């Protein structure tokens, strides 16, 4: 109404005056946006002289206040050089950082300054990686070195990052690309891309919107930095998260993770391959052969002296390679450094100005392994299950080793975890048997079968449950708050029921709690209310992103295969802010599969410590055979592992009188013993034996030289392809529905066989250009694990490629077990349907292939390797590949059944004697083996294995299995979507992927289009109340939500926004350089300085007012809302290693955007926005009225306090009011005025 009345009044002016008025207003706005506030004020005064409207008068008043504020702030913000790195950081921010955090910022800047494309910040959990990144970005933005940053993280960490940005850098423009409102997401992203700032999004949003994040106005958009938090999400290069992350163009990439290695070194390779864009560690095939295999073998207790020496030297070489790109500090390391330099951190304070707990004085942590005996009932079922086949048939749903392990783990925890049918057959109580159980539907509803059982029965059926109930009662009496972690929701159900019946006050977070606001509410309740003595959490959900320092005791009910998973759970308590001693109880049953799982945890931990530089030569606890024995039943009354650790570390325990009394009490509970997990690897091994071996063997030195040369060569090849544009990271084409459907109907047409393609730039023909001419002579047909293989040099001609290499006839090279040849091509990321391999295998067998994919090649023996690089040996790599690593590709064969048929085109290696085969046959064998590599960690799809060997496939391969199955389902869904009748009703944007590997393959390949959501073009107003000039011009721009205060409502997902303009960072936010003129308007303001808030508000004052008009027009997308719920539920899924669980794919992880199912109600302009990806349910009417009353009362109270001269109290009231309703310009300006008075 106000806008229409203003227009009516303007129309009463003469055309000349109206034109002048609108011109002055428009020019004044442009001047304000460009930072020229004096010119803007002058133009608004000219407009006022023509027609003095209320809006013009209001803007003149705001500009005058802003100019007065700037005039008072004549001094520049003060900056300090961080650790003499050259990066200037705002002094107030710098003084709040710990010393190790300053060193981390200097490391991040050194990556940029030295021209490295990326790196990994792998500090231990709880050392403040978030703060380091925020402070680093503050310095980079202040220096105008970056403009656009994309930050990707798990969903449950969004609020944490938004709060930290608002606290540490209130002047930084931070927007969230998340939530159910597509228009709001798009507007936030566009604002950052047009100006500068940080976009925060989630991995699930990345999966569904990677095209939008990678483009701007139809062109590829290159981010200055792409930063991944919890980067172990991409530990497998073939997962969809990793593929989509690679599709985002970026100048620099940073990874944050407290667990860079969780299971094997391939995960470390995957992280560096992404961070450094393939320019550091070569291809996965060569890395595994030259680095991973020797290092893993050297960590086993029964390794030979030569293997230990080789592993030590290879590990040192790997550390030298990654050192410039990798920084990791543990809590122990930082505390030790502080003890050596006590003056390093005097007078540190937190952002609120209060003294905080010095992290270097973190209290003691005792990590105890409590060895539990199985009860007679559990022991009887356990032994029978392992030894009798008919018992397995009763208890198992699918016959696979992994499913057997799942059943054994359930038996160790509680027999009631088995299905109701199995409980009835085992005569466990009088559990009911329903038809649902006959269909093997095991879900939470099965818990109803134990509702009628008494608590005493539930406790007495599990040795762990007996110990846990006694422990929790004792801890409650002592006044401790305890976290209880389990991988099973059913276990948490049992524990929760037992504790409630014992009148415990408990809280719980698991995968069923999908709303972030609900999780935060429970966390805050536990942190602030000591009456809640127990917090129940699933390991996967509660182990990441939570701070629960109110607890001092942690119970891990069941061990995970992944040592990092349990370590993350412990670090929810033992982190910065913890002031009390922490005790951890890991419950493990004696002689069972859990003890074997713990052994593998220790082995993986030794691998992690060595490869990340924590320990040069960690202690070796177990032999290879001991690690393999998963299904053997040991002594179930005592633990061999416990006795071994007792002998090694019994005298090293750090304790006090209270802890000694507590441990004595634990022994009274009938446990088998206690070990100290925190003392593992405290005994360093002498490297004398390895050093003696190094002096005697030139082979080891030459082997290390060879490994380094190969990865460097492959990395250089990758960089060359990237610089020549052969493998671009972003490709997009749009087609109309008719074109899509036309292409879709051609899927069944016979096509010439396409050549094999690679989907990652780093997984190319790894060493074909260097080693393709080597002939390997077999010395013995059947050999032990360490056989000899001799290498002679020959000249091999393959098509148009000519390879030549010369060396002495006596040189020796070694191949690891299971490798067909040195020249095998890594195709770990080759994505194909599972059934395609079987058909392809049959087809190749019909052609007469005799080579077995799993055939072992001659293995290693100590000798010498003389490597002479020659220019003639460097040949070009086959046809150019114009495909990026970020695209999921599928081939369609010309056969009737449409099975996949791939052919390798890499240069061949001639193998003499019995290993020789025709080139075509060997190519086929390599193609088969390449596909087998996709499943090498999958016991469910691999050929039957002996039970004792099965553990070799247990390296957390669920991601790979789910990835393969989900990609096949995704391919089917895409075909259906292309043929859908709805495709003809509206325009869709699609990504067309060309599967050609050469210019000639345009007609030989097929096109798969990825369906995206239809987009309705809308024009949104950027000005307030549909200004008069908008009515004349009819032009509108995007709207935006503003929250300019560091203490503003987190529900808005907005931190304060810096000044916009052609180069806003140069105008207000850059450190002052020598020789610059210091004026009141052009003084430098840091994003970390709260004084920058004044400029923020002035810059976007129109946007703040516009929210009142445009917020009512926002529409949310129910489809995406459901998608966000599904995302969080997926992120919270418990770890259940059963056959049925592992067989299920990640149904929500796809590259297509889901269609909205129904129109969403319009949101109120005054309603608070949801604080998570899941929209909050509509509040009741009375709650809305109460919130309105609270707002009015807070504003009134703030005005009264202001009149009384109580500035701080008034400011607090107004800030709380803004948290309820942040779009009131009057209250915001009043708040700014109070803040200004406090700063004077």
UniProtKB/Swiss-Prot annotation:
Protein name: DNA excision repair protein ERCC-6-like
Residues the record lists as binding ATP: 123-130
Pfam families linked to this entry: Helicase_C (PF00271), SNF2-rel_dom (PF00176)
Keyword Phosphoprotein applies: yes
SUPFAM superfamilies found in the cross-reference section: P-loop containing nucleoside triphosphate hydrolases
EC number: 3.6.4.12
Segments of skewed composition (Polar residues): 748-760, 795-809, 978-998, 1049-1065, 1135-1165
Subunit structure and binding partners: Interacts with PLK1, which phosphorylates it. Both proteins are mutually dependent on each other for correct subcellular localization. Interacts (via N-terminal TPR repeat) with BEND3 (via BEN domains 1 and 3); the interaction is direct.
Domain (Helicase ATP-binding) ranges: 110-278
